[in-house]
Every structure is written in C-alpha cells, then in structure tokens.
C-alpha cells in the first residue's frame, strides 16, 4: 500500500474525515443501487455505501489493499472486493447505476482511456461521482509524486463535459467561521502549522470556533454546489440522463 492510502485505524482523524465525507455526499444519490467504487483502497468507503442499502463492488489495482478490504470490510459477500485495473475493468458494459471514483483520476496515465472505461460500464442513465484535488493552475507535472496530472475547476469540468451531457460541480472545504477566516487571512505564511506546537494550534482553532485538522469530524467538512476558492477538492456529479 502506498503512502496515500487511507487506513481508518492508522490515518489521522481529520484526513479520514475529509475522505469519508465524499462517500457521505455520494450516498445521497443512491439507495438500493448497484455501485462500483473505483480505486476503493482498503474498502472503508465501499462498506459505508453498502451499509446504506446498496450492492457495492469495490475494485483496486493493489492486491494488498484488496486482501485487507476482504478481511476487514466484507461480510456475506458485501461489499464484493476485486483486484482490477481501473483502466481495464473486465466488467460487462452498461452494468452500474452509480460509479464513484475519489482522488483517483489524477493518478491515471491515460485519463481518456479511464473515462471511456467508466462510461462503458455505467448504465446510460447512470451517475458518475468523481473528485480530484483542487489547484489554481492545471498542470501535467504536479509536485505530488503520486500524481500524473492536476486540473483547475474549469478545466476539470470541461474534461467531464467531453464524456457527459450534464456535469454539476461541487467544492469540498473545511467549515469556517468569520473569525477563523480572518486568522487564515492574516496568517499568510501559514505560521500556525509550520512553527506553533499542535496543542496551541488546537487552542487557536477552538477560540475561532473550528476544530484543528487532526480533530476534524464529518460535520466539519462541507461539500457545496459551485466553486469556492477555499476548497481543497473538486467533486463532480456527471450523467447523461438529463440530456435525453
């Protein structure tokens, strides 16, 4: 498992909450559906969707992650975890009601091939819910060594409109108060996190009415319609259903 894998028992609460929030958001679009979770990692998100009354197949290219998911999160065959390459799924066409793929597309070398494969296995009326880190400038040489490409919101939306007729853009960000926004604005060099001990950072967060990063819970993370500059991730819900 590489360094970006989220393992609930080992990953800091704040990072886990940020990732799980996308599954909570996706859950609102599904009930009693057949779901594909692409690049499911160790399977915690697939299990979350399965517990909400959906049939879920989680696929990941990493055999270690799939073994962990099968042992930790699968019960009576649900979710079903399968090792598979996201670009070559080996699944029948027009199979799934909803496909989720969170923080995956930026890792893909062949993005167009990946999206064509998603489109192939998704039902004509299906939903594709996808997220990627938000950056101000699109680039093909990211600082993150695990990423092959990154997009700003406009370019990411344009990419998805090449494959889907109806593309809705959302932003994921941390909940903020007026005071916390002011503190962030005046702390241009991010000195709080770079030089101040964690216990003091937590106190500052408490005073400003928010939780510090290491204590974030689901309610501290917001996914809202449109693009906001404070966002850390872009989330898109795409379909062809509304264009028939």
Named regions from a protein language model:
Residues 107, 111:
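Di-metal (Zn2+ and/or Mg2+/Mn2+) metal-binding site signature of metallo-dependent hydrolases
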Residues 112-124:
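A short glycine-rich, Lys/Arg-flanked "PGG" loop and its adjoining helix->strand segment in the class I
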Residues 129-155:
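Short, glycine-/aromatic-enriched active-site segment of Class I SAM-dependent methyltransferases
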Residues 1-92, 98-102, 112-115, 150-158, ...:
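Conserved N-terminal segment of class I S-adenosyl-L-methionine
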Residues 56, 128-129:
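A short hydrophobic/small-residue beta-strand
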Residues 182-194:
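Short, electropositive alpha-helical surface patch
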């Amino acid at each position: 498992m590489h360094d970006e894998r989220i393992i609930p028992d080992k990953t800091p609460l704040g990072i886990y909450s940020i990732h799980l929030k996308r599954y909570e958001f996706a859950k609102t679009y599904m009930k009693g559906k057949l779901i594909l979770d692409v690049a499911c990692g160790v399977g915690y998100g697939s299990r979350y969707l399965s517990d909400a009354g959906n049939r879920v197949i989680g696929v990941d290219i990493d055999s270690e992650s799939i073994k962990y998911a099968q042992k930790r999160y699968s019960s009576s065959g649900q979710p079903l975890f399968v090792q598979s390459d996201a670009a070559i799924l080996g699944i029948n066409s027009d199979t799934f009601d909803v496909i989720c793929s969170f923080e995956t597309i930026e890792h893909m070398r062949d993005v167009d091939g990946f999206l064509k494969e998603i489109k192939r296995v998704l039902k004509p009326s299906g939903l594709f819910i996808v997220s990627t880190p938000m950056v101000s400038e699109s680039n093909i040489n990211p600082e993150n060594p695990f990423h092959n490409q990154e997009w700003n919101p406009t370019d990411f939306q344009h990419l998805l409109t090449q494959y889907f007729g109806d593309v809705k853009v959302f932003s994921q960000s941390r909940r903020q108060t007026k005071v916390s926004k002011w503190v962030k604005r005046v702390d241009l060099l991010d000195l709080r996190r770079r030089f101040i001990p964690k216990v003091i950072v937590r106190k500052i967060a408490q005073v400003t009415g928010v939780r510090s990063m290491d204590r974030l819970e689901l309610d501290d993370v917001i996914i809202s319609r449109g693009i906001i500059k404070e966002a850390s991730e872009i989330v898109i819900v795409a379909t062809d259903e509304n264009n028939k």
